[in-house]
Amino acid sequence: MADQPEKTAAAPAAPEAQPPTTATTTTEPAVSESQTQPEPQPEAEQKVEQATTGEEASPAPAATEPPVTEPTPAPAQEAPEDKKEEAPKEETKETKAEESKEEQKAEEPAAEPKAEAAKEEEQKPAQPEYLAKNPALSQFFDRLSAILSSTGHNEMWGVTLKDSSDVPTVNILIKFLRANEGNVKLAEEQLTKALQWRKEMNPLALTEGRYSAERYGGLGYVTKYPEANGKETIVTWNVYGNVKSIDQTFGDVDGFIKWRVALMELAVKDLKLSEATTVIDYDGEDPYQMLQVHDYQNVSFLRLNPTIKAASKKTIEVFSMAYPELLREKFFVNVPAIMGWMFAAMKVFLSKNTTRKFHPISNGANLAREFPSLKDKFPKTYGGNGATLEEDAFTVNLEKAEPAPEAPKEEPKEESKQEQAEAPKEEAKAEQAEAPKEEVKEEAKEEAKTEQPAAEEPAKAEAAVTTQEAPAAAEAK
């Protein structure tokens, strides 16, 4: 027991005996850590510092307790270190956040166009069902703007071509696409040619023109027959059996085409494509089509005549290009056997979808059988009970050729009137003047007869000769 007080008395002298450098070593790192924020110290150094600080802070009587068991000094020194360790992390987070913001700002110009494009797509209306079901039709509309720009013309069959929201425009593009069996490239080529042709030909103006009655009178008609469902059946009639002169009608091919186009445009107008409110079912029935009848009664010249062949070939080329999918059916009535060459020519220029609509009928009186609902309206000539085409149909404007001016003949007529008025006076004067002469001549003749009775026989002989020569002269004339 006597030894213990000695040990306890010596303990307070230890701190004083400590060199001052130890105190500076403990305080200097704290200052440097707060300013420079060094890396965390090793665990061994931390324990040494904890021991020294514990000795300095604790009173002398508590020195007997193990320094490790004192919990209060250690947290006091560790708390700043934890904060010091967390501070760099927080700063790095802030710097990363700032860097990310700067990167976002740098990326914003590139992202803005994408965002705008996405907004535009969202704002666009949903694609119509007829385009969604038919990708080829959608592609065709994608090309329409370029087609109209290249041709410089936007009118087709009385319809101004617009976009895919316009029903009449949709129906026209469907017709061109169906005529080419869904091939967008071929449909585009045909539409381009048709627009260019209409720009040059101006078919709408041709319907207002006037055409020779001698050349085209009685050759073409258009009829409208109302049906029970409220619709109308449009029929064009071409009666080539009424041709008066082959050379006059077919010799001028351009003139013939213009007349034929004018008649076709009248029929197309009655289809009322511009008033359409329903899109045609691509795979279904097309209500905007007409019937055509070609009558070849008494026609026996089509196989050999080159003039008619040229006109027919040109007509087929123009109509197959400019008027696709406008025919429901086409009937060739009163067709002679020699017309086979014409059907062969048509198959060359027209698609199978078109040629299957052609129906030759040898007897025109059987035509009405093809349309039982229209029998009462069809002309009697074609097996119906209706009026004739001349009475019931309409056609292009026809005019008769004006007679040639007869100005040179009018002057002689006036002179002849004056001569006729003066003739009686002159004749009366002549008769009065010649009367004495004639009386003298008659008296002389009577005297001659009495004096020369034998001269009569030669005169009779001369009369007989002239009578025999008359037929020969007449035949010679």
Curated annotation (Swiss-Prot):
Keywords: Cytoplasm, Endoplasmic reticulum, Heme, Iron, Lipid transport, Membrane, Metal-binding, Microsome, Transport
UniProt biased composition (Basic and acidic residues): 80-124, 402-450
Subcellular location: Cytoplasm; Endoplasmic reticulum membrane; Microsome membrane
GO annotation, cellular component aspect: cortical endoplasmic reticulum; cytosol; endoplasmic reticulum membrane; plasma membrane
Transmembrane segments annotated in the record for this chain: none
Ranges where the record places region Disordered: 1-127, 402-477
Protein's membrane topology: Peripheral membrane protein
Entry-linked InterPro entries: CRAL-TRIO_dom, CRAL-TRIO_dom_sf, CRAL/TRIO_N_dom, CRAL/TRIO_N_dom_sf, Sfh5
Listed PROSITE patterns: CRAL_TRIO
Gene3D superfamilies: CRAL-TRIO lipid binding domain
PANTHER family membership: PHOSPHATIDYLINOSITOL TRANSFER PROTEIN SFH5 (PTHR47669:SF1)
Protein family (similarity comment): Belongs to the SFH5 family.
Name used for this protein in its record: Phosphatidylinositol transfer protein sfh5
Gene: sfh5
